[in-house]
Amino acid sequence: MATDYYAVLGVRRDASQDEIKKAFRRLARELHPDVNPDPKTQERFKEINAAYEVLSDPQKKQVYDLGGDPLSQNGGGGAGGFGQGGFGNFSDIMDAFFGTASQRGPRSRTRRGQDAMIRLDIELDEAAFGTTKDIQVDTAVVCNTCNGEGAAPGTSAQTCDMCRGRGEVSQVTRSFLGQVMTSRPCPQCQGFATVVPTPCPECAGDGRVPSRRTLTVKIPAGVDNGTRIQLAGEGEVGPGGGPGGDLYVEIHELPHSVFQRRGDDLHCTVTIPMTGPRPSAPRCLETLDGMEEIDIRPGTQSGQSVPLHGRGITHLRGGGGRDLIVHVEVTTPGKLDAEQEHLLRELAKLRGEERPTGQFQPGQQGLFSRLKDAFNGRS
């Protein structure tokens, strides 16, 4: 009767990969030969390693769940045809016919790791002038217990006895071309040519463990929302101690209380009371990099803008800074008393905008009428 690998690890048949890995790690720590030298315990340790080798590999697990034993010598065999054990596609047929399939060779256990990405929030002034930030990232790193090899301390990977280190097995298959010899990856070693009889208890044979690291990232001036900064080799370390992938830091610019960014231009609004200092008086505006004097000329209307050239965001790829656009908003009093209304009428007369009754033309309003409408909330 076939071994019940689920029972060996003490997990349900619908257990997730995470549950299987946790169960193996727990048992491996209890039954490891360095901890418990009892010969019976060592046999039990071999059983949990075999169970984990099958259940942690999707292909082997599928074969096992269908009633096969992927660790047996004949477990990976198959009948002819185009299904399992036969030809997967036309290139397999041509490889078999011309004898090229056996030239594939074993796969390397050392592979490049996956890329990773995190989001980093920065302030507007940091985006404008650049900065340096320390970030924390959670990625896979090389297991220090096995140095990325995946084997328990004191053990090592062994040559696969099924394929004898070739990484592939051959079989005779019948097709419309007749009987041909075809090769495919060894089901026992998955094409690696070696097997790990005793996986590392710390990383469960993966050669990697999760870790939190602190990295320093330099943010150049001019970055915008969505800009990705690449840190080569700082992503996930590869299986078998392979080189790490890249880490991408995606910039997210936080809203500013005063300035709004549109491309590389900055925009802000300056409020000027109608009854305040004369419009031509210079005013000081606090920008991202200090105080700036702006000159609002006489006659400037609400809604007009004053550009400050070169006071925007420096372009990411170099060059001068763009503009800071100052939008002027002229405010009027919310309510007029009798004296204020009289003064406005006098001003309208001086400007020649108050006309006698009967001379008013549709579509034309004097200064007093326009201001009064504004004060009363009418447009």
UniProtKB/Swiss-Prot annotation:
Q: Which residues bind Zn(2+) 1?
A: 143, 146, 200, 203
User: Where along the chain is composition biased (Polar residues)?
Assistant: 358-367
Which chain regions cross the lipid bilayer? none
Question: What are the boundaries of the signal sequence?
Answer: none
The intrachain disulfides are none
GO MF, one term, reads: zinc ion binding
| Annotated region described as Disordered, given as residue ranges | 351-379
Cell compartment(s), UniProt: Cytoplasm
For this protein, the record's Gene3D superfamilies field holds: DnaJ domain (1.10.287.110), Heat shock protein DnaJ, cysteine-rich domain (2.10.230.10), Urease metallochaperone UreE, N-terminal domain (2.60.260.20)
A matching Pfam family: DnaJ
CR-type Zn finger ranges? 130-212
Among CDD domains, the record links this protein to: DnaJ, DnaJ_C, DnaJ_zf
Instruction: Tell me which cofactor or cofactors this protein depends on.
Output: Zn(2+)
Q: Which positions in this protein are listed as binding Zn(2+) 2?
A: 160, 163, 186, 189
- The record's principal subcellular location, in a coarse class, is cytoplasm
PANTHER family, per database record: CHAPERONE PROTEIN DNAJ, DNAJ HOMOLOG 1, MITOCHONDRIAL-RELATED
In the record's own words, the domains note is: The J domain is necessary and sufficient to stimulate DnaK ATPase activity. Zinc center 1 plays an important role in the autonomous, DnaK-independent chaperone activity of DnaJ. Zinc center 2 is essential for interaction with DnaK and for DnaJ activity.
| Subunit relationships | Homodimer.
Family listed: Belongs to the DnaJ family.
Protein name, per record: Chaperone protein DnaJ 2
Q: Which gene encodes it?
A: dnaJ2
